[in-house]
Amino acid sequence: CAMLFFATTVNYLDRQVLSLTWDEFIKPEFHWNEYHYGLITSIFSIVYAVCMLFAGRFIDWMGTKKGYLWAIGVWSMGACMHALCGIATEAWVGLPDAAALRAVEAGSALAATIAMVSMYFFIAARCILALGEAGNFPAAIKVTAEYFPKKDRAYATSIFNAGASIGALFAPLTIPLLAKAWGWEMAFIVIGALGFVWMGFWVFMYKKPSDHPKVNAAELEYIEQDQHEVVDGETVGKEQEGEKISFWRTLSFKQTWAFAFGKFMTDGVWWFFLFWTPSYLNSQFGIKMSEGLGVALIFTLYAITMLSIYGGKLPTIIINKTGLNPYAARMRAMLIFAFIPLLVLLAQPMGTVSYT
């Protein structure tokens, strides 16, 4: 789980660099407004969603080890490519450096050109980032299925999924400071390079349980305990592991729709906060992410998501207390979690209250 945890942490760090730097550092240079940033994040989300439809097949086809390497390699390259958008924009519009870009009169035709050209370069880099990041969770879930029996997979998933929370926690503590000290370009490069470091460890550390020298016979037996089980009166075992299910057939399963409904209710809220909270705090209250108060507020916001570790334990608790099968226990837990984001509606009446 440690490698999966760190991969997911890097995944969310890379995803957060733009949201934590655009308003304070990037917008003045490229003359952006909310339209440009909103379009970039929307296209990223769409590409990410579409790529997720095929990422699982890609991981199955490449194998867990190679598939994960490809995924994190592509998204790390995409993350680093953001740093080149300034140079590309300068070359396109014929200006020598970032200072010249910022010196262009706001509202002029040249400023509009700079904004549009830079936006398209960022969209290109963002699409590559989305292409690679889409492979993280399918690969991590596949590794979890290889190393844990069904009853333990929810908890194992919550552990690596907590990497998203840790990434979101550390992002406001590090990224604005990097951008303030060395420029927003270095923030993308430094954070993006973490993925290449992870790849070096993955090459040497990952092996399937049956091939891993540190997995003994008793542990292997525990891992494989439910590879032979009875489902609807039929024995399901290793001989059926190679069976392929088409994408369209998955839409006929109630499990697919239950999972999609749960994600629909939670992910929209999470991504909205992820992309827009830093900008909102700056525009509404004048709180900059590179300052102490901004860091503290963002850190507090994301600290709450650490509860996801305990959330992954809930299905196991339900199984032990009620005797439900793993699927039913997970669906019950997911239903509970799906309604929790609705609590954010209670914050609306407090929107006009100042923190001072």
Summary of predicted features, one role per range:
Residues 2-34, 273-278:
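Extracytoplasmic
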Residues 16, 45-53, 168-169, 301-309:
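Residue-level signature of mid-helix packing/kink "hotspots" within the transmembrane helices
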Residues 18-20, 250-309:
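Extracytoplasmic gate region of multi-pass secondary transporters
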Residues 73-115, 335, 339-352:
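C-terminal ends and interior cores of transmembrane alpha-helices
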Residues 125-165:
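Cytoplasmic helix-loop-helix junction between adjacent transmembrane helices
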Residues 164-213:
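Helix-loop-helix hairpin linking two adjacent transmembrane segments in secondary transporters
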Residues 356:
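Conserved small/polar residues in nucleotide/adenosyl-binding loops
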